[in-house]
UniProtKB/Swiss-Prot annotation:
Cellular component, GO, one term: nucleus
Name of the protein: Uncharacterized protein C140.04
Signal sequence, start to end: none
Biased composition (Basic residues): 57-67
Keyword Secreted appears in the UniProt entry: no
Source organism (scientific name): Schizosaccharomyces pombe (strain 972 / ATCC 24843) (Fission yeast)
Positions in coiled-coil regions: 87-116, 259-286
Keyword entries, A-Z: Coiled coil, Nucleus
Lineage: Eukaryota, Fungi, Dikarya, Ascomycota, Taphrinomycotina
Region annotation (Disordered) ranges: 57-94
Subcellular location: Nucleus
Gene Ontology biological process terms, A to Z: lncRNA processing; nuclear mRNA surveillance of spliceosomal pre-mRNA splicing
Amino acid sequence: MNVGKKSEIQVSAKSNLNFLNELIEEKKRYEDEKRKISHQKYTDKLLEANDNETTKRKLLVKQKRKSNKEFQSNIIKKRKDEERKGTLKTEQANEEELLQRSRLELERKAKKYDQYAAGELEIKETEDDGILVDFTRKWAEEAPENETVEITDEFGRTRSVSIYETGNTLLSQKEEYKPEKPIYGDYMPSFEVDEEKVQKLWKEDEQQAVHYDSTKEVRNKGTAFYQFSFDEKEREEQLLSLKEIHAKVTQQQRKNTEDVLTLRDKKLEERRKFLERDYAIKLGERWMSEHFSNN
């Protein structure tokens, strides 16, 4: 046996064929996988491109609609501005035309009046009515047909009557009025004041002034503000009702306070008992440790 030579591996032809078949199948599998991955990537790119295209198309449609709305609104606004400007121009033109005609007419009349004043022209009878102003006729034309005034009749009522009826109404009142006790000559009337009546009136005023009236003041009222009635009977009923409500609220508050204090005392007592028991246990343990640990 020659040790220096390398040993060769004997491989059969069948094994080579099997290996080649497996290699070809593996290569084919690899190519198929690669082709599937490439196809999937290509499909994803196409879908992404379609999505982007759809999004772009939607954005373009949205922008186009927005621009169309803005364009239409601008057209409507521009049309309204033009109509308003045209209306203003027409009104200004009409006013200017009216002013121009009035100015020309006044200038013509002024020139004609100057000629009449200088004696260059004579006033004809046919022109008399058109030149001179008839102030009587002007006042009659401007005055209302049936002007009314306010008067107070014999019953104390304020009435609106025609100006032509005012004289008769006031005249009848003047004739009907006759004083009961006329005073003639140098005479100073005296008046005796009834003290009892005055005192009674003062007491009534003071009694009424005791009660506060919130309607006489202009100010902001609080949430719990309460206006009592000025009727004494109703006022007493309101006071009694408020006193009953106050008593109920006070009793409920006192009860709640007592319940809270009772609960607090109960908790303090339980805590005290717990501490005493705990202290007794610790004291017993310490006594036991001191006496039995030495033994």
